[in-house]
């Protein structure tokens, strides 16, 4: 049975959601708009992954500074700077300026995510952590929904710059939620982390985090708009209405976050009950099969159904492994988050680089299936023992 989320969970998740608007809009819009501002395809991949590369360092910086400085202050500063960076996306077209802005966003996100997730973990009983992490992910990903879907719609109506500037202003509303969250963190969530790091389960946790990050947030998020454009052109007929490809891309990517908001708590509760070994195997296998089928299917209906199934698998995997990592303390979570970010950083570069080499965006799905196979074997070998 689902339990009611705490005030800390709800308020930090809401602040996180508001902070994500500009970042997520950029993932939906830049693959469609990069030629107008003079960027090359490989530069798109670099910009959409730069924030993740930076987090390989800043995740550990966040973990260290949380022990020394007030977490509320660090969260407020990160949310404020993150909102202002959306204005840089809106009004600058220089690759160098955009690259600096994306790196700074990576710094902000390291603090926002680490402080929020560890705050949820420190206020939750261990046996319910998957469910509470599902609530946090579900609520926070409302920001992804609005950033992607509303961003796509507003892009077709008012343009790239105005959309991102508007999202930057709205993101400042995250600050009051952070102030009222009653946030606390604990350095004593568990005493298991030093022993855990010596086991193959720890290695598998990092491998799985890499695979989850590289496929969903990396490959799919950064290339789906271009896949749609190459398959269907600039407009499609959707249930009797002609819509722009940016709107369609926003709707499809937004489905992921709608499903996350509605289903993440349930997925987390199920995996709390059946265990990470069985749950991870099911999700990796189904996701792998779906991506192979997406490579073969050209129909819009088939692509839509396949993406929905893939998103559900990704939601369950993210909730399960995030809960497993946060259960083991700040240091383990920081390293797991870095593994996810490493995968998410490689994803756009691999996807766009493969397109330049192979010449077909559909190859992204084959790459995704291969990475999920690695995750599947890692989880199978390391999480077989009784949990």
State each model region's role:
Residues 57-89, 271-274:
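Conserved MFS/SLC helix-loop-helix module at the cytosolic interface between two early adjacent transmembrane helices
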Residues 277-321:
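C-terminal transmembrane helical hairpin of 12-TM major facilitator-type secondary transporters
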Residues 29-42, 222-246:
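Short amphipathic helix-loop junctions that connect adjacent transmembrane helices
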Residues 111-124, 316-329:
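Intracellular juxtamembrane helix-capping segments at the cytosolic ends
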Residues 73-87, 168, 278-292:
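Structural signature of the two symmetry-related core transmembrane helices
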Residues 52-60, 144-145, 257-265, 344-345:
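Residue-level signature of mid-helix packing/kink "hotspots" within the transmembrane helices
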Residues 5-32, 201-220, 308:
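Pair of pore-lining "gating" transmembrane helices in MFS-fold secondary transporters
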Residues 163-179, 364-380:
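Symmetry-related core transmembrane helices of the 12-TM Major Facilitator Superfamily/SLC fold
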